[in-house]
Regions:
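Glycine-rich FAD pyrophosphate-binding loop
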Residues: 20-41
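Dinucleotide-binding Rossmann-like beta1-alpha1 core, especially the glycine-rich loop
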Residues: 44-129, 249
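Flavin (FAD/FMN) cofactor-binding and adjacent substrate-gating region
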Residues: 88-165, 177-180, 255, 293-296, ...
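A conserved short coil-to-beta-strand element within the FAD-binding core of flavoproteins
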Residues: 171-184
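Flavin (primarily FAD) binding-site architecture
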Residues: 199-214
Length: 356
């Protein structure tokens, strides 16, 4: 089969690789550079999504935990285990028993992964590990394990595997129009026909359909997630619960520095993505609420934002499902949603869908 994959983020790269491993002829089109947008602007975590358990997404969490282990086995130089602490305060957003139950369920779903199990740390033990953490009303913290990664380099590793499998990669080649009936894919320089077209363009997937006159049964919410990098080396991560919200913020090791993120803000234009002043203030305020050492804008080493394309939800952004949707229209397969961690599993599902 001759296959065109549109989108050079991690989901596109893994989809192209999956098709090529089955002997298909594959062209991968990317309007810019591989891994240059959403896929390199993540929170740098390979994770099951602990907070998704609150919304009942057990299948997604179980799959993500399995895929987390796959990435580490394949590229241990670019990904590895990381312990994170969730401080528990008296009268906090989530009761100690609730967080503990979530950690135990998370460990159960990760059975066989080889990761250590979560545990409770007393307030004194937390102070040893995070001496800068404020201890007023602190009961202790639950520790649990996930994985950190270098998203950009790990994505390039996957892209190289894709090339080695025989995929032809066309960077800086925007696709202008597609035709689900004929399989035509048109760029500025040419037009070719394919047996299958896979639209896995992430935040730009709907735009491609619109310019091609193709309708879909699904709609995407584009959600901007912003991060800042500040000085300070950490050995462990920390998960902060945001007062008055059900959201969490990560405080993570980032080389010799510390990464804070992420926000969730509606984004209209995928081409104009940058942290807003309000988001930066939000991240700084929530960090300063929990740590003794106050940071200001002058401390920021860098800031970045990415757009998560989430299948539209009737509830709030935090409750929106990160489950992906695969839609078949003739020779066209649209891929909406998805997570970095589960990109390989999503790619396998796309290949299966293409065969029916």
């Amino acid at each position: 089969m001759k296959v065109a994959v549109i989108g050079g983020g991690i989901n596109g790269v893994m989809t192209a690789w999956a098709f090529a491993r089955r002997g298909n002829s594959v062209d991968l089109f990317e309007k810019g550079r591989l891994m240059s947008a959403t896929s390199r602007s993540s929170t740098k975590m390979l994770h099951g999504g602990l907070r998704y358990l609150e919304h009942g997404h057990l299948g997604l969490v179980r799959e993500a935990l399995q895929e987390r282990s796959w990435w580490i086995r394949q590229a241990p130089q670019l990904a590895g285990p990381l312990e994170l602490l969730i401080p528990i305060y008296r009268n906090g957003e989530r009761a100690r028993w609730l967080v503990g139950a979530g950690i135990r369920l998370y460990d159960l779903l990760a059975t066989g992964s080889g990761f250590p199990r979560g545990r409770w740390y007393s307030a004194d033990e937390v102070a040893e590990r995070f001496p800068g953490l404020k201890r007023d009303q602190l009961l202790g913290a639950y520790g649990y394990w996930d994985a950190r990664m270098d998203d950009y380099q790990l994505g390039l590793w996957a892209a190289e595997k894709t090339r080695e499998s025989g995929v032809t990669i066309h960077e800086q080649t925007p696709v202008l129009r597609i035709d689900p009936a004929t399989g035509a894919v048109s760029t500025a320089g040419s037009s070719s026909c394919y047996d299958r077209i896979v639209n896995v363009a992430g935040p730009w997937a709907e735009r491609l359909l619109a310019t091609s006159g193709v309708t879909s049964a699904y709609r995407l919410d584009l959600i901007r997630g912003s991060h800042i990098v500040v000085p300070g080396k950490l050995e462990q991560g920390c998960v902060l619960q945001v007062p008055g919200e059900r959201r969490i913020l990560f405080v993570l090791p980032h080389g010799e520095d510390t990464l804070l993120g992420t926000t969730e803000v509606s984004q209209a234009d995928p081409d104009r993505c940058a942290p807003s002043d309000e988001e930066i203030d939000y991240l700084i305020a929530n960090y300063n609420r929990c740590f003794f050492e106050v940071i200001t804008r002058r401390d920021i080493i860098s800031a970045f934002a990415g757009i998560r394309p989430i299948v539209a939800s009737k509830t709030d952004f935090s409750a929106a499902s990160r489950e992906s949707v695969i839609e078949r229209q003739g020779r066209l397969i649209n891929v909406f949603g998805g997570k970095w961690t589960t990109s390989r599993a999503l790619a396998e599902a796309v290949v299966t869908k293409s065969q029916h």
